[in-house]
C-alpha cells in the first residue's frame, strides 16, 4: 500500500483548454492527450504547477525496499589446472631398502707382486717332523701283527720295531703304505690288513696259483688322535721276511697337524 501511495503522489493533473494532459513529476510521464511543447508565450501556470514542473528534472525518490539476503549460490565448476609450481625442498632420507641379490662375479684381478709358490722355510720349520720306514727281516705266518724290525727312518720316534706299531703323539692327518711279499709254493693265499686301533682300514691279498711269490699292498690317509695305533696284521698265509733286502715294508708320515 505504501508503494502505491509513493507512485501516485508525484502525479499532477492539469488541463490547458481543450488539450488537457496528465504530467508525472520525475522522469516518467503518462500522456493521454497531445502534449505540445510550451513556448515562451504559453499561458501562465499556477504556482503549484510551476513548482511541480520545475521538479520534473530531478530524479524521483527511490521506491525500492531492500529485502533479506539471498541464499548462497551453487559451487562453480573447477577451473583449469594452474601452471606447475616451483620445486619443493628435498625430503627426508627414507628407510633402508631390502637386501638385493648377490651380483655376478667380477673379472679376475691382476697378478700379485708375490714370488713363486714355493713353500717357505718357515713352513718347513713349523710342520712337525714325523715319518718312518721299516722292512721285514723275519718271516711270519698265520694271524699275527707283522713286526717290521729293520728300521731305516723313524723321525719323531713314533714307530716301535718291537711291537710293529706306530703310536701317534701329534694329532693330525697321516699317510701310510705297506707292501708284503707272500711266501708261496703250496697253493695258498695271503691277506694283510692295515688296522687303526684294531679296526681294519685297508686290506690286500696275494694269491699263489702257479708261482711261488706275490705281493699284497695298499695305502691309506688317516686322521689320528694322540694315542692311536696303526699296524699291519697278517690275516692268513705266509709273509716273506727277506733278511735285509726289505721285500716287505711299512712306512708313513704326517701330512699336517691339527
Curated annotation (Swiss-Prot):
Q: Which InterPro entries match?
A: C1q_dom, Cerebellin_Synaptic_Org, Collagen, Tumour_necrosis_fac-like_dom
Query: What is known about what this protein does?
Result: May regulate the number of excitatory synapses that are formed on hippocampus neurons. Has no effect on inhibitory synapses.
Q: Where is the C1q domain?
A: 125-258
What does the annotation say about its assembly with partners? Interacts with ADGRB3. Forms heterooligomers with C1QL4, when proteins are coexpressed; this interaction does not occur after secretion.
What are the recorded Gene Ontology BP terms? locomotory behavior; maintenance of synapse structure; motor learning; neuron remodeling; regulation of synapse pruning
| Ranges of compositional bias, category Low complexity | 67-77
Query: Compositional bias of type Pro residues: which residue ranges?
Result: 78-95
Where is this chain's protein located in or outside the cell?
Secreted
Q: What is this protein called?
A: C1q-related factor
Q: Which domain of life is it from?
A: Eukaryota
Q: Which residues form the Collagen-like domain?
A: 67-115
In the record, which residues are listed under signal peptide? 1-16
Sorted alphabetically, the keyword list is: Collagen, Secreted, Signal
Molecular function GO terms recorded? signaling receptor binding
Region annotated Disordered, chain positions? 39-117
**One cellular component (GO) term of this entry:** cerebellar climbing fiber to Purkinje cell synapse
Its main localization is: secreted
Q: In which tissues is it expressed?
A: Expressed in brainstem.
On whether Signal is a keyword of this UniProt record, the answer is yes
Species = Homo sapiens
Amino acid at each position: 500500500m505504501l508503494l502505491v501511495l509513493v507512485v501516485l503522489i508525484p502525479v499532477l493533473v492539469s488541463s490547458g483548454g481543450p488539450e488537457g494532459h496528465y504530467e508525472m513529476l520525475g522522469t516518467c510521464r503518462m500522456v493521454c492527450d497531445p502534449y505540445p511543447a510550451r513556448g515562451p508565450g504559453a499561458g501562465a501556470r499556477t504556482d503549484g504547477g510551476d513548482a511541480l514542473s520545475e521538479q520534473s528534472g530531478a530524479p524521483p525518490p527511490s521506491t525500492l525496499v531492500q529485502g533479506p539476503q539471498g541464499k548462497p549460490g551453487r559451487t562453480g565448476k573447477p577451473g583449469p589446472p594452474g601452471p606447475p609450481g616451483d620445486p619443493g625442498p628435498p625430503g627426508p632420507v627414507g628407510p633402508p631398502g631390502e637386501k638385493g641379490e648377490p651380483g655376478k662375479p667380477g673379472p679376475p684381478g691382476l697378478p700379485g707382486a708375490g714370488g713363486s709358490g714355493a713353500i717357505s722355510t718357515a713352513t718347513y720349520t713349523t710342520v712337525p717332523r714325523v715319518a718312518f720306514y721299516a722292512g721285514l727281516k723275519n718271516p711270519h705266518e698265520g694271524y699275527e701283527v707283522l713286526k717290521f724290525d729293520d728300521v731305516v727312518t723313524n723321525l719323531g720316534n713314533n714307530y716301535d720295531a718291537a711291537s710293529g706299531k706306530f703310536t701317534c703323539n701329534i694329532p693330525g692327518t697321516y699317510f701310510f703304505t705297506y707292501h708284503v711279499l707272500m711266501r708261496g709254493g703250496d697253493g695258498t693265499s695271503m691277506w694283510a690288513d692295515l688296522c687303526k686301533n684294531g679296526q681294519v682300514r685297508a686290506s690286500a691279498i696275494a694269491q699263489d696259483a702257479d708261482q711261488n711269490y706275490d705281493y699284497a699292498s695298499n695305502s691309506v690317509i688317516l686322521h689320528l688322535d694322540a694315542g692311536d695305533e696303526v699296524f699291519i696284521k697278517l690275516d692268513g698265509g705266509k709273509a716273506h721276511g727277506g733278511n735285509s733286502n726289505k721285500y716287505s715294508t711299512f712306512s708313513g708320515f704326517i701330512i699336517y697337524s691339527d
